């Protein structure tokens, strides 16, 4: 297979910011980014429940088969909410069959056919970066596979700068590869290569816009959000260069047989997470997709010990320094807020009930994440709104009547109470696998009770009563980690990066 063709690209500084270039494009008129991105997010979230990689089977008569802790794993750099079916649907069925047939018969005729297919696909997408003027005329040596992934090999160079070392992961959005950045003195970086599919490219553009503004606000990378080094368009593939990080906190948990993190590690990881997301909130930005998959260790090296009682090896991460990643769904306060946000298991009740959302929905997600670190499994393992609300009531108590009166989703309620039958298969599942929050405590030690007090306040039903992250950082559970006086800010929030 031919290798990607090399092109020299101008430095990022010479082409201006992503936002400036995006606004200056002379293509045909299109809808505003905030409208189009939000509608895309809405479509994506509305379909999430049917295809998310961690979904359980639908209700049946075999409740014993519905395991609360069964979490299927997608070995990608980050988990995302696009389905494989939606990614493939970009291509016509006939095109996919033809492509696969010709790949099996690797002849000169198949190569010409493949080029014609690439030309047809290129007419359906638009290039973006000024430095990628060559991209509008795809080089004969650059090919995509049937799903739109760039075909590459170890040792290939991109932009005469990035030398591919290995593949770190693959998702429906694209692939992430480890590269040597020869313009940064041989620094190892993670390069996200987005599929040559317009909806994924648009999501990447939105993420770039947010990351550039975060970089402007936090040039020294003190606020624990992943650092973007560079971006470019390589023959229709949006590429984003990031600092190279370790495994996600979910991947490490899975590889460790879902053994919970020790409480001192939970404390440090939770403290950093609150710091990073508070930085976003102070600058009028809501992440909207916080989950263990989107929190990565800076270095996931570990020590291995053998547990005689359980007769298995157990891993303990050496450093709990983390970074928050994946800003593709992040939303500024002034932007349109789509109805549904967040991955199901970390979705706040105001989102489920369509009461509107803002920064407190991130706090709810953080509460769910901290719980998962502590016990090793997801708090709300479901993909159905009614069942999700039933789990909340079983664990946290009744949904407030004020929220019930305000919601448009009255189909979930009857006479001011959740319409839920505990004698069904779903009802038995919730009753057998969910219990009041405090009953998940594994120790009666004071710091364990402090942790659950923090989680309870983060999982307050009503957003206005929910703990803010500024308050969370002052919680007694974090007392041993606080090095700054209570009123000292870790950053200057007087500047607004939202515009």
Curated annotation (Swiss-Prot):
Q: Where in the cell is it found?
A: Nucleus; Nucleus speckle
> What induces or represses expression of this protein, per its UniProt record?
By insulin (at protein level).
Instruction: Provide the alphabetized UniProt keywords.
Output: ATP-binding, Kinase, Nucleotide-binding, Nucleus, Phosphoprotein, Serine/threonine-protein kinase, Transferase, Tyrosine-protein kinase
Entry GO MF terms: ATP binding; protein serine kinase activity; protein serine/threonine kinase activity; protein serine/threonine/tyrosine kinase activity; protein tyrosine kinase activity
List all Basic and acidic residues biased stretches: 8-23, 47-65
- Phosphothreonine, modified sites: 127, 343
Question: What EC number(s) does the entry state?
Answer: 2.7.12.1
Tell me what controls its activity. 5,6-dichloro-1-b-D-ribofuranosylbenzimidazole (DRB) inhibits autophosphorylation. TG003 inhibits its kinase activity and affects the regulation of alternative splicing mediated by phosphorylation of SR proteins.
Basic residues bias (residue ranges):
24-33, 112-127
Q: Which GO terms describe its biological process?
A: negative regulation of gluconeogenesis; protein autophosphorylation; protein phosphorylation; regulation of RNA splicing; response to ionizing radiation; response to retinoic acid
Say if the entry is tagged with keyword Transferase. yes
Locate the active site. Answer: 289
Region (Disordered) spans which residues?
1-65, 102-142
Q: Tell me which residues bear Phosphotyrosine.
A: 99, 152
Which residues are recorded with the post-translational modification Phosphoserine? Answer: 34, 98, 141
Mind telling me which Pfam families this protein's record contains?
Pkinase
Q: Which InterPro entries match?
A: CLK_kinases, Kinase-like_dom_sf, Prot_kinase_dom, Protein_kinase_ATP_BS, Ser/Thr_kinase_AS
Binding of ATP occurs at 168-176, 192
Q: Name one GO cellular component term.
A: nucleus
The reply on keyword Nucleus is yes
| UniProt catalytic activity | L-seryl-[protein] + ATP = O-phospho-L-seryl-[protein] + ADP + H(+); L-threonyl-[protein] + ATP = O-phospho-L-threonyl-[protein] + ADP + H(+); L-tyrosyl-[protein] + ATP = O-phospho-L-tyrosyl-[protein] + ADP + H(+)
PANTHER family named in the record:
DUAL SPECIFICITY PROTEIN KINASE CLK2, SERINE/THREONINE-PROTEIN KINASE DOA-RELATED
Family designation: Belongs to the protein kinase superfamily. CMGC Ser/Thr protein kinase family. Lammer subfamily.
Subunit info here reads: Interacts with RBMX and UBL5. Interacts with AKT1.
Q: What does this protein do?
A: Dual specificity kinase acting on both serine/threonine and tyrosine-containing substrates. Phosphorylates serine- and arginine-rich (SR) proteins of the spliceosomal complex. May be a constituent of a network of regulatory mechanisms that enable SR proteins to control RNA splicing and can cause redistribution of SR proteins from speckles to a diffuse nucleoplasmic distribution. Acts as a suppressor of hepatic gluconeogenesis and glucose output by repressing PPARGC1A transcriptional activity on gluconeogenic genes via its phosphorylation.
This one is known as Dual specificity protein kinase CLK2
Q: Which organism is it from?
A: Mus musculus
């Amino acid at each position: 297979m031919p290798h990607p063709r090399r092109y020299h690209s101008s430095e990022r500084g010479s082409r201006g910011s992503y936002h400036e270039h995006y606004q200056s494009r002379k293509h045909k008129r299109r809808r505003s980014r905030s409208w189009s991105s939000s509608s895309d997010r809405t479509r994506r979230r509305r379909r999430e429940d049917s295809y998310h990689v961690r979904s359980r089977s639908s209700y049946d008569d075999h409740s014993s088969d519905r395991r609360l802790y069964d979490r299927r794993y997608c070995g990608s750099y980050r988990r995302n909410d696009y389905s494989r079916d939606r990614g493939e649907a970009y291509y016509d069925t006939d095109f996919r069959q033809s492509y696969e047939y010709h790949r099996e018969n690797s002849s000169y005729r198949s190569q010409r056919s493949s080029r014609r297919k690439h030309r047809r696909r290129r007419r359906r997408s638009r290039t973006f970066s000024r430095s990628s003027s060559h991209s509008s005329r795809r080089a004969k040596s650059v090919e995509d596979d049937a799903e739109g992934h760039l075909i590459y090999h170890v040792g290939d160079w991109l932009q005469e700068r990035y030398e591919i070392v290995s593949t770190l992961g693959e998702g429906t959005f694209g692939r992430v590869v480890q590269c040597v950045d020869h313009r940064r003195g041989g620094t190892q970086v993670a390069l996200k290569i987005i599929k040559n599919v317009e909806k994924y490219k648009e999501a990447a553009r939105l993420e770039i816009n947010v990351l550039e503004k975060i970089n402007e606000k936090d040039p020294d990378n003190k606020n624990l959000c992943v650092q973007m080094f560079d971006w470019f368009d390589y023959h229709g593939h949006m590429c984003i260069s990031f600092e190279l990080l370790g495994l996600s906190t979910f991947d490490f948990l899975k590889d460790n047989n879902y053994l919970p993190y020790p409480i001192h590690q939970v404390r440090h990881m939770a403290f950093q997470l609150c710091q990073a997301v508070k930085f976003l909130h102070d600058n009028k930005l809501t992440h909207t997709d916080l989950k263990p998959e989107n929190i990565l260790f800076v270095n996931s090296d570990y020590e291995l010990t053998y547990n005689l009682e359980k007769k298995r090896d157990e891993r303990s991460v050496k450093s709990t320094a983390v970074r928050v990643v994946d800003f593709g769904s992040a939303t500024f306060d002034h932007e349109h807020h789509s109805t549904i946000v967040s991955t199901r298991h970390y979705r706040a009740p105001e989102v489920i009930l369509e009461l509107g959302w803002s920064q407190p929905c991130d706090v709810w997600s953080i509460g769910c994440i901290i719980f998962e670190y502590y016990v090793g499994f997801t708090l709300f393992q479901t993909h159905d709104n009614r069942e999700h609300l039933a789990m909340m009531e079983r664990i946290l108590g009744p949904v407030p009547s004020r929220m019930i009166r305000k919601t448009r989703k009255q189909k979930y309620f009857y006479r001011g109470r959740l319409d839920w039958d505990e004698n069904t298969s779903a009802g038995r599942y919730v009753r057998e696998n969910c219990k009041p929050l405090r009953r998940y405590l594994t120790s009666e030690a004071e710091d364990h009770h402090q942790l659950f007090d923090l989680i309870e306040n983060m999982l307050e039903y009503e957003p206005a009563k929910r703990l803010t992250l500024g308050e969370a950082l002052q919680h007694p559970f974090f007392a041993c980690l606080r090095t700054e006086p209570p009123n000292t800010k870790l950053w200057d929030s007087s500047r607004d990066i939202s515009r």
